[in-house]
Amino acid sequence: MILKRLILMIAFIGAVILGASISHAAYIAPPSTVGEAVVLIDADTKEILFAKNPDKWMHPASTTKMVTLLTALELKGTQLDELATISSYATSMEESNLGVRVGDQITLEGVLEGMMVASGNDAAVVVAENVSGSVEKFAKDMNRVASKAGAKNSVFLNPHGLTQMGHHSTARDLAMIAAYGMKYQMFRDKVANDYYKVPYQNRTPETIRTTNHFIRNKYPGANGLKTGFTNAAGECLIASATRNGHTMIVVMLNDDNRWDEAVQFLDYGFKLRGVI
C-alpha cells in the first residue's frame, strides 16, 4: 500500500512538472513596442492578439486613405472605369501628392490606385468629389462604411488624413476596418502594389513607387496596407501579411520603430497560430 501511494505521488508530481514545462514552453512573449497605440489582429477570426491603448483616440494621418479606398469601392465598385473630374481644390492639397492636374483624363480606378501607392492627398480629394459630390458628403459616407466594418470610436472628416480637429480613429477601429476590407479581392489588389503606372490618357503615364517600405522590403506574405505621417500623428503603419491562407494585420500609431515592429508583430501572430 505504501509503495502504491509512493508511485502515485511520484506520478502526480511528474505530471505537474511536465504540465508546467509544457505550459512554459507554449508561452510566446509578445514583442516590445515604442508605439503609442498598437493592435495585432487575426483578420480571419477578428481576435485581438496584442493591444496597447487600442481605444485611445489618435490622429490616423494617411491610414485614413484605407477608409477612403473602402468607401469608394463600396459606393462605386462597379463604376471605376469612369473618367474622374479633377478640381482646382484637389490640386491645391499639401503633400504628399499624386500630381494630378485640372483637365487630366484618368479613370476613378487610376486615381484610387495612385492614391494608395503615392499616398496622394490630391487623389483622395478627387475620389471624394467624384464618389459623393463633395468632401463633406464623402466624409459622412466614410463614417457609415467604417461603422459597418466594425469601427466604434472613429470620426473621419476628410479623405486624406491631414490633421483636422475632430478627425480621429483608434488602433482597434483601424484593425477592424482593415480586416473587413481584406475580405474583398478588389480591396486586396489595391493595397498591395509596389509600383503603379498612373494611366493618364492625355499625357505620358507616370510610374510611381509605394511609400510603404513594408511592401518594398518583401516581408514573406506581405500584401498591404497603408502608411501615414503627420507631425500630429507621428509615424503610422497598417501592415498585413498572409501565410498558408491565414492573414494577420498590425496597426501601429505614433510608432518611431514601425518597420521593424511590423515584422516582429506579424511573426509573433503567425507563431501564435502555428503558421510558419
Where are these regions (language model features)?
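Hydrophobic alpha-helical segments, especially transmembrane helices
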Residues: R5-L6, M66, T247
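Hydrophobic alpha-helical segments and their boundary regions
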Residues: K4, L8, P31, G35, ...
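Short alpha-helical segments used as structural interaction elements across diverse proteins
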Residues: M1-I2, S62, N223, R258
